[in-house]
Amino acid sequence: MKHDSTIDANEVAFYSRLADTWWDREGPFWPLHQLNELRTAYIIDKLCRHFDRDATSDRPLSSLRVLDVGCGGGILAESLAGFGARVTAIDVVEKNIRVASLHAAQQNLDIDYRVETASALADAGEKFDVVLNMEVVEHVADFAAFMQDCCRLVADTGVMFVATINRNPLSWLFAIVGAEYVLRWLPRGTHRWDWFRTPAETTEQLSKGGLSVVSRAGVAANPFNRRLRITKSMKVNYMLFASRS
């Protein structure tokens, strides 16, 4: 894999150490397992509306080409493959891809896993109906370049989902102090506050890449029961749904 300005070596090393714990629902990635049910429902709803699909069918995403960027252990990729999507999933951490590939095989799911960057796929001219940019933005070294690479991967009638963390005092308090040090929901060092991006910054990059935001939502966590819910407030975690058309 050639040098890419969006890759941070410390991030790669951090997730390499945790790779074997992706599918441990009580391990360090338990928040992602909690979040996955919520975000999958959000994604399915938006895709069915955009592509005029029957949300009540068993495989509402059948034939849609979906790219999961920064797929980790494949938690979201497996969910969407189960709904019929043709999923390609990429990550720069080789151990993540090995873990994800093995787990998908055990579940009899056909997912195209690759150790690859968004930039390399875009340079190769690949296009997808759906690009998933979920919980990745806050881990890349070059935000603008990464976002434009992802935008290049969206087909003419395609869409992109972005989920990340806002940058303000509240997000520092909740996403870093609270989640990593007080509640210890996440390993210390998971996030860097200066790499968080505001909704305005993310929207600007989407616009530069030819995409328009059509839906916004926040995600809130209950510290007492560890449950997550969709909310209107985007003060901390937020999701954007953007369309090329």
Model regions and ranges:
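N-terminal, positively charged/glycine-rich alpha-helical extensions of SAM-dependent methyltransferases
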Residues: 1-29
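Conserved short-loop catalytic and cofactor-binding motifs
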Residues: 3, 27-31, 134, 190-193
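Conserved alpha-helix/loop element of class I SAM-dependent methyltransferases that forms part
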Residues: 34-62
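Rossmann-fold NAD(P)-dependent oxidoreductase module
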Residues: 46, 79, 205
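Conserved SAM-binding loop
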Residues: 54-59, 64-170, 199, 240-242
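S-adenosyl-L-methionine-dependent methyltransferase catalytic module, highlighting the catalytic core
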Residues: 95, 103, 107, 141-245
